[in-house]
């Protein structure tokens, strides 16, 4: 993503997981793990939306981890419809937490990566080690996607998304009374909207200091 990006391999359930790591300037304030779009449709950790999510996390002072899914780059294995990918991301989360113990964890995903991150978030809750925030962009809902996410989940979608239609995301969010941030006139890949997307994510996750006007 930049000259300071480090690439490393973490041992996973079926072999190496190929991960890009970016560190913020100064003392880290958190950990962020970013999941990329569908590998069978060209998705990699270098996808522009995935990189935008990583940049937003860096701007917040988070260490940003961007693994490649199975069969992408140097990551071992073959596409597993989100099951093995969930297992791999849990390994990355554990490794990242070991490297920076005590820091809050943000899970972020784009398209197919949202499906995987929702599964990861549920597994972490079940294990008693929940993430602190979940960010979903172009949310891909599948038959085995968990039906509930934390109430403070950040959900961002493009009005003109023709890959993941808005109506499906609304049908998933409605029973949870889950708010959704809608970008008018925006398609699935957020062309010409990446800077705005970054600002929205930063604003949604940044701690706020509110003062009462005198």
What is each PLM-predicted segment?
Residues 14-16, 25-66:
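Short, surface-exposed "cap/lid" segments of acyl-processing enzymes
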Residues 149-151, 165-173:
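Short alpha-helix in the alpha/beta-hydrolase fold that links the catalytic acid
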Residues 1-27:
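N-terminal cap/lid segment of alpha/beta-hydrolase-fold proteins
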Residues 77, 186-198:
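Catalytic histidine-centered segment of alpha/beta-hydrolase-like enzymes
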Residues 79-99:
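Alpha/beta-hydrolase active-site loop
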Residues 108-117:
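Gly/Ala-rich beta-loop-alpha elbow adjacent to hydrolase catalytic centers
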Residues 149, 154-157, 161:
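Short beta-strand/loop motif that positions the catalytic acidic residue
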Residues 159-164, 188-189:
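Acidic catalytic loop of the alpha/beta-hydrolase fold
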């Amino acid at each position: 993503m930049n000259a300071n990006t480090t690439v490393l391999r973490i041992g996973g359930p079926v072999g190496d997981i190929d991960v890009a790591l970016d560190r913020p300037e100064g003392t880290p304030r958190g950990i962020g793990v970013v999941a990329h779009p569908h590998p069978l449709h060209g998705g990699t950790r270098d996808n522009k939306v995935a990189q935008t999510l990583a940049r937003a996390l860096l701007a917040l002072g988070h260490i940003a981890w961007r693994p490649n899914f199975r069969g992408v780059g140097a990551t071992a294995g073959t596409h597993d419809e989100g099951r093995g990918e969930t297992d791999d991301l849990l390994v990355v989360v554990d490794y990242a937490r070991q490297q920076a113990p005590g820091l809050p964890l943000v899970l972020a995903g784009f398209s197919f990566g949202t499906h995987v991150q929702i599964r990861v978030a549920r597994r972490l809750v079940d294990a008693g080690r929940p993430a602190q925030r979940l960010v979903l962009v172009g949310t891909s809902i599948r038959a085995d996607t968990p039906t509930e996410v934390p109430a403070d989940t950040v959900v961002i979608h493009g009005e003109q998304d023709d890959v993941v239609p808005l109506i499906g995301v609304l049908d998933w969010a409605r029973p949870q009374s889950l708010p959704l941030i809608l970008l008018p006139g925006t398609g699935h890949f957020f062309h010409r909207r990446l800077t705005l997307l970054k600002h929205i994510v930063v604003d949604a996750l940044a701690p706020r200091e509110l003062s009462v006007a005198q």
